Regions:
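ABC-type nucleotide-binding domain
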Residues: 326-579
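Helix-loop-helix
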Residues: 48-50, 54, 147-161, 231-305, ...
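An intracellular "coupling" helix at the cytosolic face of ABC transporter transmembrane type-1 domains
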Residues: 10-13, 98-102, 118-127, 131, ...
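Transmembrane helices of ABC transporter permease
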Residues: 10, 14-27, 38, 59-62, ...
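Pre-NBD coupling/linker segments of ABC/ABC-like ATPases
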Residues: 314-330
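Membrane-integrated ABC transporters
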Residues: 1-31, 36, 44-60, 65, ...
């Protein structure tokens, strides 16, 4: 938690001035009951209208000064809390960018969104309230008690009894509810996760007529959240009635003692009014303090959750130095897997086992296998999205762990299974590949990706707007644009992870032909379910349940690999299976 306080360093002045101005406001408020007592004891008793007007003027002046102090305090507290949450949100987002796929998988997208939004908003609100009330409320409570002693010592003893009782109630509720708020936030994460999952997969839900099932799942999770919120609410709700009971009993005692003191001449009527006002001030401030404690308890629980994300260490460390010379025997190597195994965090079984192969510069490598065979897992090791748990992965003669992040990303471009575009324009999306690319570079990449024709057909061409997620484009258009984006960076290794699944066979064939015709020695990995897309590859890796079932050319695999032969035969006529 101390690390999070570092983000307040730029707002030390505001953190000091906000509570000081609130205490100044409170100081003027403490004089109000004494002025009212004077009005009753002197002005009303003597029927002195001028004296009453003078004292009313003083009350008005105290109110104006108090308002000015309050507004100033609010300005400083808002500046500090908003600035703090902004800095913390930036730091949290920047930290999330350093996390590997492993940490992202472990934490979960919905959890991170909650930390960035709901949790940080709670922290901001809690800090704002804390800066305004953490000194003011105790100051008024103890200040009112001291002022009560200046009025009448015997009556003030009632304050000595009431304040500890009120403190027990307030702090008791705080101790009980603080851990419960953590549970509330955890269950809120679950509800948000289900909501996100449902909205993301809305079309699938409707296609399988599972609307009611999803409603039931949501209602179950929401019921658990509601149950815990009600439990916390019931405990928190005890605070106000208990404090009011104690305060009202104290006021009754004050009136009794005051009446006795007035009867014996120890007090004036105005003094009783002042004491009751002080008791009411204590009541108001303790209610504020109670709300402050509830809000701060929520904020601390949320801050702990944000801190947990900040404390999550990136599982991958990247060196700063570029690796040295390539050994002579590896000069022609692009990618080498040496007895590689991969087991995801929290997974019971390995996704890849004992994978070994070498891809040379300029080769096209096909990767094929059944669903869940480990195709995407294999190619994700090349750009180091994950680290192999066994064996080693090398690119251009050096282990992937020896490359700085920027160097590695510059050498390897990946087109993911899911075509992801960002809100902006076609141009802005393509420039992700290379911010300095010219229009000629962009059009060349679009030509290779078979996307130039449909981009030319758009009224604004490269400047055609793209909605978030590419909602205004078809699946095939999105895939071609993501391929073009990868080509803009002119990588040495291009990975197409089943990224042409939405393309028709003719477009797919044209894409492969265009890739083969590119100048240079770019190594291409094509992950596909279509045997036809891979049969002209220099090598084809056949995966079966995480194992390398076959390695060779199309003809070699048809002759030697039953798994490949079965895949090929299932997609073509049996009579053509050996062709």
């Amino acid at each position: 938690m101390n690390k999070m306080l570092d983000y307040l360093n730029g707002y030390k002045r505001e953190c000091v001035l906000a509570p000081l101005f609130k205490m100044l406001e409170a100081s003027f408020d403490l004089f109000v009951p004494l002025v009212m007592a004077d009005i009753v004891n002197v002005g009303i008793a003597a029927h002195d209208f001028h004296y009453i007007l003078m004292r009313c003027g003083i009350l008005l002046l105290l109110a104006i000064i108090g308002l000015a102090c309050s507004l100033t305090a609010q300005y400083f507290s808002a500046k500090a809390s908003v600035g703090y949450s902004t800095a913390l949100r930036h730091a949290l987002f920047a930290h999330i960018q350093t996390l590997s796929f492993t940490e992202m998988d472990t934490l979960g997208t919905s959890t991170l969104i909650t930390r960035m939004t709901s949790d940080l908003n709670q922290v901001q609100s809690g800090l704002n309230l804390f800066l305004r009330l953490f000194l003011r409320s105790p100051f008024v409570v103890f200040g009112a008690m001291i002022m009560a002693f200046t009025v009448n010592v015997r009556a003030a003893l009632i304050f000595v009894v009431a304040i500890p009782l009120l403190s027990v109630v307030v702090f008791g509720v705080m101790v009980v509810t603080r851990p419960l708020y953590k549970t509330v936030q955890t269950r809120l994460d679950r509800v948000l996760g289900l909501t996100r999952e449902n909205l993301t997969g809305a079309r699938v839900v409707r296609a399988f007529d599972k609307e009611q099932t999803e409603v039931n799942r949501f209602e179950d999770a929401n019921a658990l959240l509601t149950k815990m919120q009600l439990h916390v609410g019931h405990i928190s709700a005890l605070m106000n009635p208990l404090t009011y009971v104690i305060i009202n009993l104290a006021i009754v005692a004050l009136l009794y003692v005051g009446s006795v003191q007035i009867h014996v001449g120890g007090m004036a009527s105005g003094d009783v009014i002042a004491l009751v006002n002080y008791m009411n001030q204590i009541l108001v401030e303790l209610v504020k303090l109670a709300n402050l404690i509830v809000q701060v308890s929520k904020a601390l629980a949320c801050a702990g959750r944000v801190q947990a994300v900040l404390d999550t260490k990136p599982g991958m460390q990247f060196p700063q130095e570029v690796p040295g010379e390539v050994p002579a025997e590896k000069q022609n190597d692009a990618v080498r897997f040496d007895h590689v195994g991969l087991t995801y965090a929290g997974a019971g079984a390995p996704s890849l086992t004992d994978i070994s192969f070498t891809a040379e510069k300029g080769q096209t490598i096909g990767v094929i296998g059944g669903t869940g065979s480990g195709k995407s897992s294999l190619v994700s090791l090349i750009p180091r999205f994950y680290d192999a748990t066994e064996g080693s992965v090398e690119i251009f003669g050096h282990p992937v762990q020896d490359y700085p992040r920027e160097e590695l990303r510059g050498k390897v471009s990946v087109v993911m299974q899911k075509a992801q575009l960002f809100g902006g324009t076609i141009r802005s999306n393509l420039l992700w590949g290379n911010q300095n690319a010219s229009d000629a570079d962009l059009w060349a990449a679009l030509e290779t990706a078979q996307a130039a024709e449909f981009v030319h057909s758009k009224p604004l061409g490269l400047d055609e707007p793209v909605e978030q997620g590419g909602r205004n484009l078809s699946g095939g258009q999105k895939q071609r644009l993501t391929i073009a984006r990868a080509l803009v960076s002119k990588p040495e290794i291009l990975i197409l992870d089943d990224s042409a699944s939405a393309l028709d066979y003719a477009t797919d064939a044209a894409l492969r032909k265009a890739l083969a015709a590119l100048p240079g020695s770019m190594t291409v990995f094509i992950v596909s379910q279509r045997a036809a897309s891979l049969q002209h590859a220099d090598q084809i890796l056949v995966l079966d349940d995480g194992h390398l079932a076959g390695l060779g050319t199309h003809a070699e695999l048809l002759a030697s690999c039953p798994v490949y032969e079965e895949i090929y035969a299932s997609q073509f006529k049996k009579g053509d299976a050996r062709q």
